[in-house]
């Protein structure tokens, strides 16, 4: 069995919308890598999605990936909602356009290239890796605020 790659992801936004950042702590066995970035004008949900996208984009080959996020929006979107959105032509059950569909489509493509499972962690609750991802996201946002 492949050693899984763990992606601990988080997004941050100073104002919503406003300056935002994303952060990823990657762990593969004893190896770690930190990624972060940001945008001048964005939302917290876009940064949560971007964190996962950037983590997956950094992988160099097909992997078993465990994504640990404190975002119910991202986890529920990928595990539950996306199937209906795709069936409905990227419309919600209320027939409204899916928000952030550009990022959802990119994430859907990237997830298809790996064996991915999703884990939700409570944010700001002392989970060491999530706190590190949060710090990285805030560093990303600080570049634009």
From Swiss-Prot:
Protein name: Ribonuclease H
Gene: rnhA
Cited InterPro entries: RNase_H (IPR050092), RNaseH-like_sf (IPR012337), RNaseH_domain (IPR002156), RNaseH_sf (IPR036397), RNaseHI (IPR022892)
GO terms, molecular function: magnesium ion binding; nucleic acid binding; RNA-DNA hybrid ribonuclease activity
Cofactors that this protein relies on: Mg(2+)
Catalyzed chemical reaction(s): Endonucleolytic cleavage to 5'-phosphomonoester
Residues annotated as binding Mg(2+) 2: 10, 134
EC number from the UniProt entry: 3.1.26.4
Record-linked SUPFAM superfamilies: Ribonuclease H-like
Record-listed Mg(2+) 1 binding positions: 10, 48, 70
Record's subcellular location: Cytoplasm
Annotated organism of origin: Neisseria meningitidis serogroup C / serotype 2a (strain ATCC 700532 / DSM 15464 / FAM18)
Main location: cytoplasm
Top-tier EC class: hydrolase
Keywords: Cytoplasm, Endonuclease, Hydrolase, Magnesium, Metal-binding, Nuclease
